């Protein structure tokens, strides 16, 4: 069983170089995060296709990660956003990387209208303590970010989706000036704290389930 799964996305129409995939790889390879977790997290950069939810995401979830930290890009956002829920809706206006659109307006016709992340508020606090002015968001979109989040939240393990804006270009400093730290580096450092929150919640979950099972067994006997 892997401790933590970190996901990002590959390119899609209008975003030929997706920073979320680069950030996911950078975070998963971070020595700091490995020290926090005591293990190397798994990393999955999803093809931005609806079919990848079954061909790529489902096998990763079948390995039963204890927690999932998901990253996507939202070019219209001005700061990092912590998504509090995934909704059972798909837009048919925006094709994926293969040119396909959602087949139905509901991602899961038999599923609930929304799934919430109990860990979102705690993750936002951790990000803000790490120096990021992270905002809470109730709208993960109607594209692959939302669809994948809705799917993962259905697994029951602690999971949070973080939307990042397009990172600004790092300009050369003026003579005598200091070079600004690249946005991806800043985000990776802060996201390690989000991963810490999820990992702690993930490790506590089996104990809680075992206690609940023991209480039920005692009651049934």
Over which residues does each language-model region extend?
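Glycine-rich phosphate/pyrophosphate-binding loops
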Residues: 159
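N-terminal catalytic or cofactor-binding beta/alpha core of small enzyme domains
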Residues: 1-142, 153-156, 175-221
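Small/polar glycine-rich anion-binding or flexible loop at a beta-alpha turn
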Residues: 140-145, 166
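An accessory alpha-helical subdomain
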Residues: 163-171
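A short, acidic, amphipathic alpha-helical segment used as a generic capping/interface helix at domain edges
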Residues: 146-152
């Amino acid at each position: 069983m892997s401790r933590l799964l970190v996901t990002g996305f590959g390119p899609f129409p209008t975003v030929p170089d997706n920073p979320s995939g680069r950030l996911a790889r950078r975070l998963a390879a971070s020595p700091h995060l490995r020290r926090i977790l005591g293990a190397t997290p798994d990393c999955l950069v999803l093809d931005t296709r609806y079919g990848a939810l079954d061909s790529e995401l489902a096998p990763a979830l079948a390995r039963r990660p204890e927690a999932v930290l998901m990253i996507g890009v939202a070019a219209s956002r001005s700061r990092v956003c912590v998504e509090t829920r995934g909704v059972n809706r798909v837009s048919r206006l925006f094709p994926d990387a293969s040119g396909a659109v959602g087949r139905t307006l509901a991602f899961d016709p038999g599923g609930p209208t929304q799934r919430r992340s109990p860990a979102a508020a705690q993750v936002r606090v951790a990000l803000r303590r790490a120096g990021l002015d992270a905002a809470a968001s109730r709208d993960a979109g109607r594209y692959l970010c939302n669809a994948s989040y809705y799917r993962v939240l259905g697994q029951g393990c602690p999971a949070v989706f973080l939307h990042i804006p397009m990172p600004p270009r790092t300009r050369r400093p003026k003579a005598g000036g200091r070079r600004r730290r690249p946005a991806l580096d800043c985000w990776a450092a802060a996201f390690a704290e989000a991963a810490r929150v999820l990992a702690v919640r993930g490790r506590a979950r089996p104990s809680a389930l075992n206690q609940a099972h023991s209480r039920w067994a005692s009651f049934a006997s």
